[in-house]
Design a protein with these regions (language model features):
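Acidic, glycine-rich active-site loops and adjacent beta-strand->loop/helix elements
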Residues: 154, 199, 288-289, 312
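A conserved acidic, glycine/proline-rich C-terminal tail/linker
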Residues: 263-301
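Active-site microenvironments in enzyme catalytic cores
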Residues: 4-8, 39-247, 251, 339-343
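Glycine-rich active-site loops that engage anionic ligands at enzyme catalytic sites
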Residues: 37, 207, 211, 215, ...
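Short, surface-exposed charged micro-motifs
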Residues: 16, 180, 274
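Charged, cofactor-coupling segments
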Residues: 1-35, 208, 215-229, 258, ...
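Generic beta-strand/beta-sheet core signal
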Residues: 248, 285-286, 311
């Protein structure tokens, strides 16, 4: 089952629904037509808080919709390509873990390429690179394995098909495709999976390793989630999905979720050791190796149309806008494609 939140051209109010074939259908409509009534399908918060009962109820009316889609009227179902897909759940918290070691190694190499002569950042980056190679500390009895993460800007969450304003402070805007899990509740921790595109400004990143990522990660519409919340039965093995990034119609990056080092139960255990996650908490596992400009030192230009596709999870689209004015001086050499924005 693919759960969605969407708006239509006639209504700006978010609607909680499901995908039935190629249609976005409100769960309220399906319940009414199927003669069912569950208090847990009114919105994503209620759905997540009441798993697994809510999932069973949603699947029941979704099955009815598959059989009777033709009976729904014009204002009861909507072509997917005619609605605006929002982030698939009302997000309670957004955490981003670093559980893809090869991406971290690749990133350190590219960052060091440009920062090696900087006395402020080079020692820190070298220490980071050395830490990646260090043996893991011995487990502490009674404590889950510590896993590195940072907390994301809740004010910059966006859904599918958004245009990302190009920040004036960067010449290297980048995608970061990640597998994300949505937390349900203690009865059913895994509500499902979605795509997380953690858009990043690379030429300011090295300066923020100590205090935390601000300029690097907190740009408008920089935390993209979607296009659906896919339940586990449709995902299969979430840790063995092909990933492709298409830019302007051409495949640019490819990777796999098989390089994620830990599973959902591991991140839930570590978060729960400090405080239990709330329903609707979204956790990114880490950037898929080989799927960013930073991995290859090969970046995306302004105006690009981008499609991030995860096998079984769908395609999350965005566009990098053209800068609206002159860009600020970059800490790194300016790429030829960006020269015109610095004149």
């Amino acid at each position: 089952m693919k759960l969605i939140r969407f708006t239509t051209t006639d209504s700006p109010n978010p609607c909680f629904g499901v995908v039935v074939r190629d249609q976005a259908v409100p769960l309220a409509v399906l319940q009414s037509k199927a003669g069912k009534s569950s208090p847990h399908l009114t919105d994503s918060r209620s759905y997540l808080a009441n798993l697994p009962d809510s999932e069973r109820a949603a699947k029941e009316v979704c099955a009815w919709g598959e059989q009777h889609l033709g009976e729904l009227g014009k204002n009861e179902c909507f072509p997917l390509n005619a609605v605006r897909l929002l982030e698939p759940v009302e997000v309670a918290a957004l955490f981003d873990f670093g559980l893809t070691p090869r991406h971290l190694k690749n990133s350190a190499e590219t960052l060091m390429k440009y920062e090696k002569d900087n006395p402020q950042t080079a020692p820190m980056l070298q220490a980071f690179a050395n830490a990646l190679l260090a043996p893991k500390p011995k487990p502490v009895p009674g404590r889950p394995e510590p896993l590195p993460y940072y907390k994301c800007n809740m004010n910059t969450i966006a859904g599918d098909g958004e245009t990302v304003p190009w920040p004036a402070y960067t010449s290297r805007l980048d995608v970061e495709p990640e597998l994300a899990v949505v937390y349900g509740n203690e009865k059913q921790p895994v509500a499902g999976f979605c795509i997380f595109n953690d858009i990043s400004a690379r030429d300011v990143q090295a300066t923020e390793f100590v205090g935390g990522f601000c300029l690097t990660k907190d740009m408008a519409k920089g935390n993209q989630l979607g296009p659906y919340l896919v339940t586990l039965d449709e995902v299969g093995d979430p840790y063995n999905l092909k990933v492709t990034v298409v830019v302007n119609g051409h495949a640019k990056y490819q990777g796999s979720t098989s390089e994620v080092s830990h599973k959902a139960e591991d991140v839930f255990a570590w978060l729960g050791f400090m405080a239990h996650p709330k329903p609707g908490s979204v956790i990114g596992f880490g950037t898929i190796p080989d799927c960013t400009g930073l991995d290859h030192d090969d970046f995306i230009d302004p105006g690009a149309e981008i499609q991030v596709t995860f096998e079984r999870l769908g395609t999350l689209r965005c566009r990098f806008a053209e800068p609206t004015g002159k860009l600020l001086p970059s800490r790194w050499p300016v790429r030829p494609q960006m020269q015109k924005y610095h004149v």
